[in-house]
Every structure is written in structure tokens, then in C-alpha cells.
Amino acid sequence: MFNGKNILITGGTGSFGKTYTKVLLENYKPNKIIIYSRDELKQFEMSSIFNSNCMRYFIGDVRDKERLSVAMRDVDFVIHAAAMKHVPVAEYNPMECIKTNIHGAQNVIDACFENGVKKCIALSTDKACNPVNLYGATKLASDKLFVAANNIAGNKQTRFSVTRYGNVVGSRGSVVPFFKKLIAQGSKELPITDTRMTRFWISLEDGVKFVLSNFERMHGGEIFIPKIPSMKITNLAHALAPNLSHKIIGIRAGEKLHEIMISSDDSHLTYEFENYYAISPSIKLVDQESDFSINALGEKGQKVKDGFSYSSDNNPQWASEKELLDIINHTEGF
């Protein structure tokens, strides 16, 4: 699907973008991979690792629609990974978060239309479901924009979908690098917000492969959610440092005890497939008569029961401490 195609990744110098680029180069023969981001140092560092002839590096911000549109010329597929994502930072800088996560999302949509992009997938987060913080609220708004964009598309070829998942192992600013840094510094204890806290868990590699698959299975308008394990934060801390004690510091501003990826309010829109769920649009899409119980590959899903929810505390799949370490070690070696 990606052989001979032009692919643009917003926020492409981040953990996801670098892993996505690696997987594309190892498994496909794209014509161009365009890394669109605003940090020149990160682009310089990435270009020294990924220096294939097909690589292109564009300095630009998703807040700048004109620059986005220039970068998207002749692009076939877009992965929108750029976001302001750290919950406390967003709480203290709300308008900056809105400009990047909401206005930036609309700019991506507009640039896709202007350039006749075939498909665009936006990355979302479990925090967008029943949000209690600004980051989650902006990502919910972003999700709504990308789903509704399929109506704006009308008879045009551009289609938009969303991929939502939980905590990514080893991503910048996540809990694993934070804990490992404290351990390396000789800390005698690890800070835990609440012993009851649970989170969804996915490796960078699995996240990338899920997005790649969604390009093939999407009609446009779906929110894709992978079936992934949950973990307790205390189990993660013990797996990384079994001899260290835990210091309870309390939940930070905007945090939840448990994350939700599908709320019971969306159960009437949700289909279960073998390895993932798909939430169909809550609005009728004009000029698109898709049966969301069957994906574009012809695979059939089943409607979930009324009242179904998918949260990190009611998840039937849990990662053991050994599995957590295996995922961490595999991610670091990937």
C-alpha cells in the first residue's frame, strides 16, 4: 500500500514518528517520507539516522496552515502525530494547547483537502474519552474534527480516521523513562500518584503497526482502538525496581485513577473485531454509505452489548511484571 507513495508525518521527530519511519523503511519502498516538525535540532539528529534518499525534512508548525499545505504537495497519506500532550503543561498553558491540538488539527484537515491527500489518520489518546483535563478535551475536539471532515470531503477522495490508544512504552516524557532516570540517579524510592491507578499499555512498535493496518481497513470516520493490556502503576514500579519503596504523592492536576478508551455512551456505535474495536461515527456521513460492521478489508465485526465500556480497570487483559519488562526491553532494542 505504501510502495511508491508519498507519506507525511506531522510531529515526525517524536517517538512515534521515528518508529513509524523505521518500520516504513524496513518493510516498504515509499517514494517520499516527509517529516514535518518545528524543532530543527531534532530534525538534524533524526536526519543523521534516517538519511535515505526518500527522506525529506520540513521545518514547520501545525499552527501554520500555509506551510502545511506546501509540505503536503503530492502527498498520498498523512499521519497526524503532532500534539501538545503533557497534561500538567496543558493545564497551565491552556490556549497554547488549544492552538496546537484543535486549530492545528483543522489546519491538517484543510491542507489535506487542498492537496488531494487520499487518507489521513490522526493519533488520539485514551484521555479523549470522558475527558477531565484540557489535553483530553482538546483531543476529543480534534477527534470530532477528523470524523466530521469526512462530511466536508463529500465526493472528494480524502478520507479521515482516528486511532486511539493508551500509554506508549518509552515515549518521551512517559513514566518508564522517568522511573529509569530516578533509578539511575540512585533514588531510594519511586513516586506513585495512587496505588489504585491503572493504565493501558502499548509498545511503540505495536502502536505503529496498528496505525499501518488502519490505513488498509478504514472507510473514513472510524475511531480505531486496539485490544491492549492494562497495568497497575505499582506493578510497573516494582518490575523496574523491586527493591525500592514507593512514595505516594497524590494525583496530579487533570489525572484520572483509570483511563477509558470506550465509554458506555458509545457502546451503540462500537463494533468488536478480532484484535481491535471500531467506534462508528455518531453523525450520518453525507455521500458515504459505509457499513462499519465490515471494514474495508472485508473483515466482519460484532456489535458490542449495550452499556459496554473499555477501561483500564475492567480490561480482561492484564500485563504481568515479566510481560512489562519484556515489552520495555523489546522497545528499547527496537
Swiss-Prot record:
Concerning Gene3D superfamilies, the annotation shows: NAD(P)-binding Rossmann-like Domain (3.40.50.720)
Pfam families this protein is in?
Polysacc_synt_2
The enzyme's E.C. designation = 4.2.1.115
InterPro entries tied to this protein: NAD(P)-bd_dom_sf (IPR036291), Polysac_CapD-like (IPR003869), Polysaccharide_Synthase-Rel (IPR051203), PseB (IPR020025)
The cofactor(s) it depends on are:
NADP(+)
Summarize where substrate binds, as residue positions.
Answer: K85, N167, V175, T193, R252, E255
The catalytic site is made up of K127
- Top-level EC class as recorded in UniProt: lyase
What's this protein's name? UDP-N-acetylglucosamine 4,6-dehydratase (inverting)
Q: Which organism is it from?
A: Campylobacter jejuni subsp. jejuni serotype O:23/36 (strain 81-176)
